[in-house]
Amino acid sequence: EAPAGRGNAQYSGDLWGLYLHVEHTDSRFLAERGLPDGNVYKIERNQGDRRNQGPTQSSTPSDWNSFRDNYNRTQSLNWWRQNLHMPTYYTFRSINRIISNVDLRDGWNHVCYHNPDGHWYPVPWDLDMLIIPETHWQGAVNLEKSLRQYRTLKIEFKNRARELMDLLVGDASPTGGQIGQFIDEQSRFINPPGQSLTFVDVDQLMWNY
């Protein structure tokens, strides 16, 4: 880019501002976390867009379609425990509420991993609308039916939510709690202290004016 210019004209070349690294939910995503090779779907329009094919699982989205159709019906407590990895769902639901993920809704903006043991794991995806003062969408998926149907599951969820709130946001000061420390640590990569101008300033000039 030219060292000087007038207004936005100096940013009209190949500079696109600050970008993030995105980890795709494919076989490498599973291997990095020590998870067995299984089907992974990005959920769009309630359909499963496959991102990974498990060697022992359906080569069509029939496993996702069956799970989706069944969780939208009333199911037994045992069905929920056998088909949805409840501890993962409790964490997924809690964290989405903490970070105000308002673009999440049923059929969109999340990923589902099908473990060969039969359990489904919801995974966050499309996280560009966080911590904003808007309702937009409900910020939940219909897996929440499990909590409404069974008080036992709702109590387990509330216990996990309380645990995460105490850990992450129990301290209301600007740099408090684990989440405040994490944000402070990460921000130093792009906005190191002691520098008069950083990449944050470049990004602000690129998009905010």
Across the structure, where does each feature detected by a protein language model lie?
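Internal "kinase-insert"/substrate-recognition segments embedded within catalytic cores
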Residues: 2, 6-98, 102
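Middle-to-C-terminal accessory/interaction subdomains
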Residues: 7, 60-61, 65-106, 110-209
